[in-house]
């Protein structure tokens, strides 16, 4: 008897992401004709420990990744029960046999892994988030909206990569999200008034990139926008420093705001900012090997969620170091950093067992697929980072969260969040 859940076909397709760069979409189909897909996102600012993408012609195509899906992965997964996520991912890991997924490509592997999960949920007639959550009733995560861009995400002189708002003190996700949109619109007006309408064009993640030079200029703009919109004490602030990108390893200094700072001076810089602004979230404040400095900052900023992205790259090996050193209260969750859904589950489960907040994140190169929104709800992520409330590949995720809240009546995580 044929198992209707058995994988009948795996097929790769070259598509483009939100930056116009090629990426891979993988389709997984069962014997019963049920099919879904997974897209591989791509980051601009990457940790050195991330899974390696397979690309060709200086990154201009992913033809080899498509061939790998069609001629290596397809026969390897033929006949496997699509509900067996762990088995599927282990087969992919074993065939690849490298620590950084460089043989099959992290992009090929994660697209296949996502496609299998989505196909399994579809075959069972379940929403993706319900399939992941099981019997648990999850909450809608708090959004972290990146509304001013700097660093590798912008063409200005700001070194901090993302300036973020967090709408926390609201009863529903819808209330929180639309309040954040008011702040975003207010910010757009301020930028247009002060710097000209040309600077209200948006960057890769939907945020603005005004001609700013120093960190406090960006923070002042956002703080003013929050107050003008009437949400002081309800909407808070955060930053993703992506500090590895402005760290000079030869000098062992951080080049920021026209100064060269040693790690201790940079720590004091962050402490001063936390006194001046309602900053409750700080991601990658030091370069990616500075577990001790992360921990020192977290210890001194107890009410701020210091979070590791490049520090951990969704890899359990590095999370264990961070747990031992008490480096952070938060972790970024990016499935494509490690390469499979199963490894991502291992990472999030370990973080949860150690009372570490989960921050599920998009990448700067995204597609219109809203998988990451469902994934964030399913794992009961505390937060979700998926850009500003602009650009279709960002708003598709927010619209999915609005739909889930409306259809299933899930509670908003911010309602119960205490700083």
UniProtKB/Swiss-Prot annotation:
Binding, (2R)-2-phosphoglycerate: 161, 334, 363-364, 385
Keyword Metal-binding: yes
MF GO annotations: magnesium ion binding; phosphopyruvate hydratase activity
Protein name per its UniProtKB record: Enolase
Enzyme class label: lyase
Biological process, per Gene Ontology: glycolytic process
Required co-factors: Mg(2+)
């Amino acid at each position: 008897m044929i198992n209707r859940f058995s994988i009948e076909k795996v097929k790769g397709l070259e598509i483009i992401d939100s930056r116009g760069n090629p990426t891979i979409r993988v389709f997984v189909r069962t014997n019963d004709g049920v099919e879904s897909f997974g897209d591989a996102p791509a980051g601009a600012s990457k940790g050195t420990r991330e899974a390696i993408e397979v690309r060709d012609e200086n990154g201009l195509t992913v033809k080899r990744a498509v061939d790998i899906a069609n001629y290596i992965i397809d026969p390897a997964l033929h006949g496997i029960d699509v509900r067996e996520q762990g088995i599927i991912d282990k087969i992919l890991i074993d065939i690849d046999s490298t620590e950084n997924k460089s043989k099959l490509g992290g992009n090929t592997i994660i697209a296949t892994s996502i496609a299998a999960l989505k196909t399994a949920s579809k075959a069972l007639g379940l929403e993706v988030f319900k399939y992941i959550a099981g019997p648990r009733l999850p909450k809608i995560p708090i959004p972290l909206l990146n509304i001013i861009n700097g660093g590798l995400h912008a063409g200005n002189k700001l070194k901090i990569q993302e300036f973020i708002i967090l709408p926390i003190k609201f009863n529903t996700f819808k209330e929180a999200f639309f309040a954040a949109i008011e702040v975003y619109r207010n910010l757009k007006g301020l930028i247009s008034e002060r710097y000209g309408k040309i600077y209200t064009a948006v960057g890769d993640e939907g945020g603005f990139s005004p001609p700013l030079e120093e960190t406090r200029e960006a923070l002042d703009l956002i703080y003013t926008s929050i107050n003008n919109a009437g949400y002081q004490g309800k909407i808070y602030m955060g930053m993703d420093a992506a500090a590895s990108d402005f760290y000079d390893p030869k000098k062992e200094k951080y080049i920021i705001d026209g100064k060269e700072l040693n790690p201790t001076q940079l720590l004091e810089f962050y402490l001063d900012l936390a006194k001046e602004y309602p900053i409750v979230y700080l991601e990658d404040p030091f370069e990616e090997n500075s577990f001790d400095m992360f921990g020192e900052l977290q210890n001194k900023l107890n009410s701020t969620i210091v979070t590791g992205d490049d520090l951990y790259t969704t890899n359990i090996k590095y999370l264990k170091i961070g747990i031992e050193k008490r480096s952070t209260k938060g972790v970024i969750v990016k499935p494509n950093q490690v390469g499979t859904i199963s490894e991502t589950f291992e990472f999030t489960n370990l973080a949860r067992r150690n009372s570490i907040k989960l921050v599920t994140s998009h990448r700067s190169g995204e597609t219109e697929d809203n998988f990451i929104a469902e994934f964030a709800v399913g794992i009961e992520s505390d937060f979700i980072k998926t850009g500003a409330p602009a650009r279709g590949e960002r708003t598709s995720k927010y619209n999915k969260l609005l739909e889930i809240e409306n259809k299933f009546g899930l509670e908003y995580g911010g309602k119960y969040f205490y700083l």
